[in-house]
């Protein structure tokens, strides 16, 4: 009978409710852990692998020599390359260089396979698209990413050069 009386008093006094409110009040006055994503961003690690980038040489010439090693090594088969046979006789160039970002698993094997460091992983990964076809990055988009993130990519590659 004594145990039943304790349970009745606990349920009438709503002990669990007051315990929960105490926990809530305790956490209410602590600093926030949550990051408000679009406005605030967490810093990425130096070796973060984001959206792909095609690089150019300092003179503006494309680095890619259309060897297709990145296409061959990609485990997800996310890279598609066509060789441009009509443009120059002394150097092979790509006519089509497409990457399906939804297929890609961001493993970095394409970056490791490239003999001229033409394709590297960029410093950002924002994949909020309104159109499903936006997941396909074409050659001009990849080159534009390379130009806009050039300083960050060069700094990362120089810092990581001793491990390559």
Curated annotation (Swiss-Prot):
Co-factor(s): [4Fe-4S] cluster
GO-annotated cellular components: plasma membrane
Ranges in coiled-coil conformation: none
First-tier enzyme category under EC: translocase
E.C. designation(s): 7.1.1.-
Catalytic activity as recorded in UniProt: a quinone + NADH + 5 H(+)(in) = a quinol + NAD(+) + 4 H(+)(out)
Classification via Gene3D superfamilies: 3.30.70.3270
InterPro entries: 4Fe4S_Fe-S-bd, 4Fe4S_Fe_S_CS, NADH_quinone_OxRdtase_chainI
Highest rank taxon of the organism: Bacteria
A GO term, aspect molecular function: NADH:ubiquinone reductase (non-electrogenic) activity
Alphabetized SUPFAM superfamilies for the sequence: 4Fe-4S ferredoxins (SSF54862)
Cofactor comment: Binds 2 [4Fe-4S] clusters per subunit.
NCBIfam families the UniProt entry points to: NuoI, PRK05888.1-4, PRK05888.1-5
Listed PANTHER family: NADH DEHYDROGENASE [UBIQUINONE] IRON-SULFUR PROTEIN 8, MITOCHONDRIAL, NADH DEHYDROGENASE UBIQUINONE IRON-SULFUR PROTEIN 8, MITOCHONDRIAL
Function of the protein: NDH-1 shuttles electrons from NADH, via FMN and iron-sulfur (Fe-S) centers, to quinones in the respiratory chain. The immediate electron acceptor for the enzyme in this species is believed to be ubiquinone. Couples the redox reaction to proton translocation (for every two electrons transferred, four hydrogen ions are translocated across the cytoplasmic membrane), and thus conserves the redox energy in a proton gradient.
Protein name: NADH-quinone oxidoreductase subunit I
Organism: Magnetococcus marinus (strain ATCC BAA-1437 / JCM 17883 / MC-1)
């Amino acid at each position: 009978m004594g145990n039943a009386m304790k349970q009745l008093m606990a349920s009438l006094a709503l002990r669990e409710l007051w315990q929960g409110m105490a926990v809530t009040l305790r956490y209410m006055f602590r600093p926030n852990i949550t990051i408000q994503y679009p406005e605030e961003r967490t810093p990425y690690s130096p070796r973060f692998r984001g959206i792909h980038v095609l690089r150019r040489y300092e003179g503006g010439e494309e680095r890619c020599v259309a060897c297709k090693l990145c296409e061959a090594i990609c485990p997800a088969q996310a890279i598609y390359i066509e060789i441009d046979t009509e443009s120059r006789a002394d150097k092979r160039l790509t006519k089509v260089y497409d990457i399906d970002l939804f297929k890609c698993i961001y493993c970095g094997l394409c970056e490791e396979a490239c003999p001229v460091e033409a394709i590297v992983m960029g410093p950002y990964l924002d994949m909020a698209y309104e159109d499903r076809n936006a997941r396909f990055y074409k050659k001009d988009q990849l080159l534009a990413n390379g130009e806009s993130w050039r300083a960050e990519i060069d700094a990362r590659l120089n810092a990581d050069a001793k491990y390559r």
